[in-house]
Amino acid sequence: MSNSIQAIRNVYDIEKGARDNESPMSDEEIVKLLERTVSDKSLIPNYHRFEKGYAAEDLFMRIFSLLPWVKTVVPLGQEQFPEKSKEELQVPDYEITFEAGSESNTSCVLIEVKLVDGDKQTHELQKYKYDVLKKYSCQKNEPLLFGIFWRKQGVWTINSIESFAEKSSAYKISYE
């Protein structure tokens, strides 16, 4: 599945590049490219959901890289090997290096980007997904934060897990 997720990301990047060059791809062209490159065909109907998530990740990177105290925003990529490793350890979306008190003193944080779309006012993070992200964070000895884009409000929030309410199988956060 990991290779299929990376293939979907590659199609998104190609589609975005074509659009940026004022030569947008048709839906048929996108579907053909997905069919040729994505081995797990069950993921293809979910392309638009992936597309929204990738667009949120791109927006996060562009906005937060403009902050004067941010030194670097490094995408950590969608591809992870061995594929089964995501069951126990998952790499988040970004590592950010920022000034911590002075220009010469820097710190790093790991960011997992989430999109809350439509009229939703809450986001749920499954505990097992948090656990595998947290394990990576602990191994890197860097804090894990969540960059959440609340589309309806047009607002980003940066949250630690402590901002979420713990439920039986998930952590839940509300914009309200």
Where are the regions that the model predicts?
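Acidic-basic catalytic patches of nuclease active cores, encompassing PD-(D/E)XK
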Residues: 1-12, 17-80, 139
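Short, flexible/disordered intra-domain loops and linkers
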Residues: 45-49, 84-85, 119-125
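Conserved catalytic cores of phosphodiester-cleaving nucleases, focusing on short active-site segments
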Residues: 64, 93-98, 104-118
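Short, surface-exposed basic-aromatic patches at helix termini and helix-loop junctions that form
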Residues: 65-69, 99-101, 134-141, 162-166
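Active-site metal-binding core of divalent-cation-utilizing nuclease and nuclease-like domains
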Residues: 74-104
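Acidic carboxylate-rich catalytic motifs and surrounding loops in phosphoryl-/glycosyl-chemistry enzymes
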Residues: 76-78, 146-153
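Short, charged, amphipathic alpha-helix that recurs within catalytic cores of restriction-modification
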Residues: 118-149
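Domain-level recognition of nuclease-like catalytic cores that cleave nucleotide substrates
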Residues: 149-176
